[in-house]
Amino acid sequence: MLLTVFKQPVLVESFLPGREFTVGIIGTGKDAIATDTMEVCLKAQAEPDVYSYINKENCEELVEYRLVYDEEAQQVRETALSAWRGLGCRDAGRMDLRSDRSGRPNFMEVNPLAGLHPQHSDLPIIFSLMGKTFHQLIDRIMHSALKRVQDR
């Protein structure tokens, strides 16, 4: 039916009902490091099941962001860092992952040009939750870019 309606190839994927995470990555190649893992927790009044545009744009009322350090979160960090390096991403960005029914993290997307709005973008939010300033985030991004350019 989807092929008939849209008249182009359609990608159908299984819904991942588990926890949703995002991890910041700073650096390039072997020098890349993962930030702490942030879990995206939707509040009762949020659109259910997904970190939608509406939920993100109204995050103060609809979303709770929290840093998590359990075993699943550690797997998320390792997967995110491995994907970042494998894709050849540089300097700074963000990886989104969501767990399946059994709690196994699945890669959803890479954001190699992650938003940098100090209050509304996930990468600065992670840094803030880690007790770091927006200026420290920008400093780390600039340091990575300068090192990469100087190492050419």
List PLM regions with ranges:
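ATP-dependent carboxylate activation and anion-phosphoryl transfer catalytic cores
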Residues: 70-152
